A protein has these predicted regions:
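Feature for exported/extracytoplasmic and membrane-associated proteins, marking the mature portion
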Residues: 1-315, 320-328, 347, 364-367, ...
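Residue-level detector of short, conserved catalytic/binding motifs and their immediate flanks
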Residues: 45-46, 171, 334, 360, ...
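Short, glycine/acidic-enriched loop or turn micro-motifs at the edges of active sites
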Residues: 54, 294, 344, 455, ...
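Glycine-rich, phosphate-binding/catalytic loops in enzymes
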Residues: 65-68, 354-356, 435, 491
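Beta-strand segments within the central parallel beta-sheet cores of soluble alpha/beta enzyme folds
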Residues: 284, 332-339
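Histidine-centered active-site microenvironments of extracellular/periplasmic hydrolases
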Residues: 340-371
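Low-complexity, Pro/Thr/Ser/Gly/Ala-rich linker/spacer regions in secreted
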Residues: 429-441
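C-terminal outer-membrane/trafficking sorting elements
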Residues: 440-450, 454-528
Length: 528
């Protein structure tokens, strides 16, 4: 079943007397319908979150070459020889198991953020995970996630009324049995769907199992949070588009033995869905085992052990994922970011392990990343009761991603993260997101809408190469006309029209530029 057929069946569009958001679906009929269905399949930026469950030991992940004496004194029984470190610069190096990611770093596609944490850190796995996923302070208990709140603003009312012509695909996908707090919206509704494991994906693609029932309504979400979070097996409405995307692309990069490296198995699937044109905005994958209280290294072999194996998995999986994206030509659309609920203490314990700590490094990978060491490494001697002090708040990283990758307005970011946070440059200049690249038809070109998403006034830029009347219109997600921005003869060359969105509700709108029989359409997201 192709995407158009799937949407027609699932919403009753055009031919069946169904309603969408209380409006008759014949509003979708006519030439605009074709435009909405034929919007660029690869129009949105993608964020891939890699969760390292258990609390990753950052001190043995990014090695402090320039603090070697303090490092050896604090953890002599698990200290990795600095001669084995994979140098990032003269001061820092990666664990020797991370050769693949080190090569990607050398290709200027990896940013390293050291000392990422938050004030008054909590060393409980469950509580600290909630803090990272909710984007809250340690003294706040929040029942929604930072990504969920962002997506909730971009796709208001989800899941009611979805899929739509503008967003026919899952908004977010988590490779897990349930959707995590990070993807939970303000009404405690899941903003995505869960694929329990890689086997579930391949069963779905091969048709050996169904996607389950439809998504529950928002009313059900409010009355039964667990039900809406546990959407695995209930997202049949999206199974067809996932199968269609998977059929469009095969993995090109070598991911190694994915039966052993489960992170590689998950990222392999994400690459296939992105390359296949799925418009999903956020993916969440994970790897467990980082709670290394004991046997983190082998006795007398500090470069080997459970932590080395895990870091090797992360390194190989992320590097293969980046190569796969590049082989498919979609690398500019994807940003990959690691996180863990906390780091480990500076001092090792007597069991060849480390105990719960505070700050730890994050890796951000992508072709648009400002590569290199982005934040300073904490001191191994100036400690907070034996723990590393933080160099940067994790919410500064979130704010930077929201602003520089997704193009979110600072006022929107303040609402998402509950306060203002200073950002750190992580995305190359000129790479700020827009929903659609320039599209052309005949002598007509519609450029990227800026900013996008937009809170106030957007600028619509277009180029005219033929001496015919031009019309620029805005429609809402149901196909109803909202505004005409320009109409009449235009001189040859580029033109622009401002569009004040301050009176519009949040949601996805469509700008349609027409000239004779030629027309081009781009999506624009309004946030409040």
């Amino acid at each position: 079943m192709n995407r158009r057929s799937f949407l027609a069946r699932s919403t009753g569009a055009v031919t069946l007397p169904f309603l969408v958001n209380g409006l008759p679906v014949h509003a979708f009929d006519g030439p605009l319908l074709a435009d909405l269905f034929n919007l660029a399949e690869e129009s949105d930026r993608v964020l891939v979150l890699v969760q390292l469950n258990g609390g990753n030991d950052g001190v043995n992940t990014v090695l402090p070459i320039d603090q070697e004496a303090a490092y050896k004194a604090a953890r002599s029984n698990i200290a990795i020889p600095m001669s084995a470190a994979l140098k990032l610069n003269d001061a820092l190096g990666l664990h020797p198991a991370m050769a693949d990611l080190h090569r990607t770093f050398g290709e200027q596609k990896v940013a390293v953020l050291n000392g990422v944490g938050y004030p008054n850190p909590n060393q409980s796995h469950f509580r600290s995970t909630d803090i990272w996923m909710s984007g809250s302070s340690s003294n706040q208990v929040v029942s929604s996630g930072w990504v969920g709140r962002y997506l909730d603003g971009v796709y208001p009312g989800y899941p009611d009324g979805y899929p739509t012509a503008a967003m026919p695909d899952p908004i977010a996908i988590q490779m897990s049995a349930v959707v995590s707090l990070a993807l939970t919206g303000v009404q405690q509704q899941s903003m995505g769907m869960a694929l329990q494991d890689p086997e579930t994906f391949y069963d779905l693609v091969q048709g050996t199992t169904s996607g389950g029932g439809g998504l529950p309504s928002q009313a059900e979400a409010r009355s039964n949070v667990a039900f809406i979070r546990d959407v695995q097996g209930k997202a049949q409405v999206y199974s067809a588009v996932i199968k269609e995307a998977a059929a469009k692309a095969d993995n090109i990069a070598d991911y190694g033995d994915t039966r052993v490296n489960r992170l590689a198995a998950q990222l392999q699937i994400v690459a296939r869905m992105v390359a296949g044109g799925l418009k999903t905005r956020v993916y969440v994958v994970s790897l467990g085992g980082f709670d290394t209280h004991a046997a983190q290294t082998l006795e007398g072999e500090p470069t080997n052990g459970s932590h080395a194996v895990l870091l090797g998995y992360v390194s190989a999986a992320m590097a293969a994922f980046q190569r796969d994206l590049e082989a498919h030509g979609v690398q500019d659309r994807v940003l990959t970011m690691t996180f863990s609920e906390f780091g480990r203490r500076v001092a090792s314990n007597l069991s060849l392990g480390t105990d719960h700590g505070t700050s730890a490094p994050m890796f951000i990978m992508g072709s648009k990343v400002i590569d290199g060491i982005r934040t300073p490494y904490p001191s191994l001697t100036d400690l907070d009761r034996g723990d590393l002090k933080m160099s940067i708040d994790f919410r500064q990283v979130y704010a930077s991603v929201l602003e520089q990758w997704f193009g979110a307005d600072p006022a929107v970011i303040r609402q998402i993260l509950f306060q203002d946070f200073e950002t750190v440059p992580i995305i190359k200049a000129g790479s700020t997101t827009h929903v659609d690249d320039a599209t052309s038809a005949g002598g007509l070109t519609l450029y990227a809408i800026s900013p996008n998403p937009v809170r106030g006034t957007a600028t619509i830029r277009y180029r005219v190469d033929a001496a015919l009347p031009v019309r620029v219109d805005v429609y809402d997600a149901l196909g109803f006309h909202v505004a005409t921005l320009a109409e009449g003869h235009h001189s040859h060359g580029e033109h622009s029209a401002p569009f004040n969105t301050s009176t519009l509700p949040s949601g996805t709108y469509h700008v349609r530029c027409s000239q004779g029989r030629q027309h081009v359409t781009a999506a624009m997201v309004v946030v409040r």
